[in-house]
Amino acid sequence: MRKITTAEALAAQIQDGATIAISGNGGGMVEADHILAAIEARFLQTGHPRDLTLIHSLGIGDRDCKGTNRFAHAEMLKRIIAGHFTWSPKMQALVKNNTIEAYCFPGGVIQALLREIGAGRPGLFTHVG
């Protein structure tokens, strides 16, 4: 069964404390920014969702306001697990000021871990971290 929904309806389903994994190619390419914008808009209007954990393996953003910059609100984001923060200056500021928990792992390790989680396997051992 195929189900099509709006970005706003999708954003409304995200609960406080949720973990969200996003993907893209960095530099504002191949990113579902319309959905990310709807999540941010909901937070700015209602204060929810809050205390999120955000996971991404590649830098996602445009060095301005898109991508992970949309999650760069202290109350919205509790922690980020990422390959790097190059494309998100607002996220860099939260990390630099210890406003949120931040973990930086190799992008390939994050991608492999997400694959293992999606397959229902227990985890991942790697030589690099």
Question: For each predicted feature, which ranges?
Answer:
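Conserved alpha/beta enzyme-core scaffold
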Residues: 1-129
